[in-house]
Amino acid sequence: MALPGADTFPFRDDRPGGLREGWEDGGVTGTLVLAGTPIGDVQDAPPRLAAELAGADVVAAEDTRRLRRLTQALGVAPAGRVVSYFEGNESARTPELVEELAGGARVLLVTDAGMPSVSDPGYRLVAAAVERGVRVTAVPGPSAVLTALALSGLPVDRFCFEGFLPRKAGERLTRLREVAEERRTLVYFEAPHRLDDTLAAMAEVFGTDRRAAVCRELTKTYEEVRRGGLGELAEWAGEGVRGEITVVVEGAPDKGPEEVGAEELVRRVRVREEAGERRKEAIAAVAAQVGVPKREVFDAVVAAKNAAKDEAKNAGI
């Protein structure tokens, strides 16, 4: 099933010829459709979703069992073939689906909840389809990221989605330190049994007073949004939390150059070094962030290093 006007859909390319060989000249006529699914309340399903499920030649689902429950709730039966498409089989399944698309099939991709590709399977298939010259379109739907941002009460004019943090404590701290000075609002997904440890780590890196919102079970019966400082929220989460979690964290405060002394410059360089940056790059990044010459940051780091050596020498170490 082709979309009206699909034969004129432009796909620009920098290679000679201007347009990659594709459906415009009859080479590729298939279409990949990314469809959003409810994050909780099935009534939030996009109206077009049922039509796409009924009309697609192939439905690729993150979990075919959850897809079955969704189609039953929507009162629709997929007319095409249903296949699984999840993290464990993405590599093998992607070429198969691209071949179907190249042959003219309309392939619908859905995940368990929300939009495909957003911390869910999808982007590999999109990239492969684009490379092959396949038309890619979407049926926009619910998003836990945008819903949590809207409910958080924090600035949402600029934000950064960080997905899930690493499970290991050390790796989690490293990842958080990488964005310790990020001024945009941060959004994370987290499992309920790790929430208290994650919030405690955030409080350690960002500060206990940094504002945040924990959004739980969005659009479901027991939806809850808990707002407060990271320290307060970490203590609350220690009592046990259930459900699907999205955490929204306020960005770092905007500190003017006059507030950043030598000690703070050195601290920021160390944070970046601990996150894996080389000293030269860390110094350049801090200088650009604060708005001071790189030489000023370099001198502060050298002075701190020399002071530490003198202190160790005087202590007889």
Tell where the protein language model's regions lie, with residue ranges:
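Glycine-rich, flexible N-terminal cofactor/catalytic loop recognition
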Residues: A2-E87
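A contiguous loop/helix-start segment that scaffolds small-molecule binding in enzyme catalytic cores
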Residues: L3, D7-D14, G18, G22-D25, ...
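A short, charged helix-loop
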Residues: L32, F159-E181, G251
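Short active-site oxyanion
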Residues: L53-V59, G133-T137, T185-L186
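General beta-strand structural signal in soluble alpha/beta enzymes
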Residues: A61, A138-G141, Y188, V214
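Conserved helicase motor
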Residues: V83-S91, L165-K168
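Short glycine-cluster motifs
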Residues: A102-P166
